[in-house]
């Protein structure tokens, strides 16, 4: 099953990546410029799993005349900034709500060329083994961007840790918390 999932994701990445390259004509056997030089596609990605997926599909792209140049970023702001500045041809790391939020906040007009998987969220701790063990007043780290913060708060609500207002959606913030029985502190 893991191999099948990997192949599916690789195909998805390949499709999304090539969609940004334009359409080939029937006369073109590989992706090359007018002089026959292979096309270089510079893509920004976060390390896991996006960079790994791109490395997986890079040999297949090379067979089609596309040299994939991967630029790794360790935060979620720089890939979009680099793309908007023309330093990249594409990036691969975000879901559509994050892209829309980034465009709105930064006055950019970046567009999606294809859907990708959405990273799962979970609760992690080196000390606490279950939600019930969370101490009163404990600090819980949450993402610092609007869309992923909302996803994290919805996850916390689903585990009974907090209650959000009925109007809270994917862009929920700490202000949308209407019940916090154990007085948790949230740190973006």
Which residues make up each language-model segment?
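Sec-dependent bacterial lipoprotein signal peptides
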Residues: 1-19
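Bacterial lipoprotein signal-peptidase II cleavage site
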Residues: 18-32, 38
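Short, well-ordered beta-strand elements
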Residues: 36-48, 66-72, 139-140
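Beta->alpha turn/N-cap motifs
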Residues: 48, 75-76, 86-100
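Short helix-initiation/N-cap motifs at beta->coil->alpha
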Residues: 71-81, 168-188
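Alpha-to-beta junction loops
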Residues: 84-94, 138, 161, 182-185
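A conserved helix-loop-strand patch within extracytoplasmic ligand-binding domains
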Residues: 113-162
């Amino acid at each position: 099953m893991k191999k099948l999932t990997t192949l599916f994701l690789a195909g998805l990445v390949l499709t999304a990546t090539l969609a940004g390259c334009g359409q080939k004509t029937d006369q073109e056997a590989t992706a090359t410029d007018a002089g026959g030089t292979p096309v270089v596609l510079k893509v920004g990605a976060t390390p896991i799993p996006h960079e790994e997926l791109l490395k997986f599909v890079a040999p297949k792209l090379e067979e089609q005349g596309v040299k994939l140049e991967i630029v790794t970023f360790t935060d979620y702001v720089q890939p979009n900034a680099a793309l908007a500045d023309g330093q990249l041809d594409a990036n691969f790391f975000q879901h559509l709500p994050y892209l829309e939020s980034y465009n709105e906040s930064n006055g950019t007009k970046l567009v999606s060329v294809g859907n990708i998987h959405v990273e799962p969220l979970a609760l992690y701790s080196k000390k606490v083994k279950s939600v019930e063990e969370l101490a009163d007043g404990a600090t819980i780290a949450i993402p610092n961007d609007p869309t992923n913060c909302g996803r994290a708060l919805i996850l916390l609500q689903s585990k009974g840790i907090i209650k959000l207002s009925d109007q809270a959606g994917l862009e929920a913030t700490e202000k949308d918390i209407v019940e916090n029985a154990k007085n948790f502190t949230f740190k973006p």
